[in-house]
Design a protein with these regions (language model features):
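N-terminal signal peptide c-region/cleavage motif recognized by signal peptidases
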Residues: 18-20
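Interaction/scaffold regions that mediate signaling and macromolecular assembly across diverse proteins
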Residues: 24-79, 83-90, 94-274
Length: 274
């Protein structure tokens, strides 16, 4: 009898786990609906702005989505595929960044939130996996953790609510489209001449490539392990030479790794649409 009860208990536990796993919406439709509604494409689709005033009127829908993320147990998350995990973490980062802005709106820059002893990126204002979490914990301690995903393109997917940052995507990231979405975000950002350009004999790129340059020199092969190992920024820029420069001669210099590299000033102004 005891063994029968034990078997029933185990079966029930497995059933509950499977129901829980099935219950999470990996299409992230709730977030998809919100960004489709409140993200405005600019610069020919290479950048975006966010209508935070209108977003604030959909606060209940945003809260419901963020609550669905917080409800996912860590054990369930660990059982997902890497693309599912990454899509979850990227959307979570972007969703909680919007929430942080709305909590402090109106604000001219995300850097105006908090101070020396209350870093906005280390503020524990939400929960994931039953733990107090903060934005840096998602980006730097999880997404960028060596050996976890090894995917430099994630820098073009997470959005820090700033003009200098890669755009907030106008759709949710999903596992089935992740590689295409990451590549498209990369090309959009690199082709935006306000943030990356070849000028006066120099390749001028975003400060992102300076702050996180180790991500382009650690031999990363992408989340699926299929990307040729990334060993240097110069080698990676060479892959995107036709995106980074407009003139064929300039593209050739980048492709050959002969371009001098400089960094553009980062614009921390809020990416708000008016």
């Amino acid at each position: 009898m005891k063994s029968f009860v034990k078997i029933v208990g185990l079966a029930l536990g497995a059933l509950l786990f499977s129901v829980s796993a099935a219950a999470f919406d990996h299409s992230h439709k709730a977030w998809d609906d919100l960004v489709k509604k409140h993200v405005v494409l600019i610069n020919g689709g290479k950048a975006s702005k966010v209508n935070y005033v209108a977003f604030g009127k959909d606060r209940a829908a945003l809260k419901a989505y963020l609550d669905s993320l917080s409800a996912v147990p860590e054990s369930e998350f660990k059982g997902w595929s890497k693309p599912q995990q990454m899509a979850f973490l990227i959307n979570a980062y972007n969703g909680y960044t919007v929430e942080l802005i709305l909590q402090n709106y109106p604000v001219k820059s995300i850097k105006d939130i908090g101070g020396v002893f209350d870093n906005r990126w280390k503020r524990k204002f939400f929960k994931l996996f039953g733990q107090d979490f903060y934005l840096d914990k998602i980006e730097h301690e999880t997404l960028r953790k060596p050996g976890a995903y090894d995917e430099p393109r994630v820098h073009f997917a997470v959005n820090c609510a700033s003009i200098g940052c890669p755009m907030l995507r106008e759709e949710a990231f999903t596992a089935d489209k992740l590689d295409r979405q990451l590549e498209e975000q990369t090309v959009r950002f690199l082709s935006d001449r306000s943030r990356n350009r070849y000028a006066d004999g120099k390749l001028e790129v975003s400060m992102i490539f300076n702050w996180f340059k180790d991500d382009w020199s650690s031999g990363y092969k992408g989340f699926d392990g299929k990307t040729p190992a990334i060993t240097s920024r110069e080698a990676w820029f060479a892959r995107y030479a036709k995106v980074l420069a407009d003139a064929p001669a300039d593209q050739q210099k980048i492709a050959e790794g002969k371009a001098a590299i400089g960094h553009l000033e980062y614009d921390w102004s809020l990416n708000g649409a008016h």
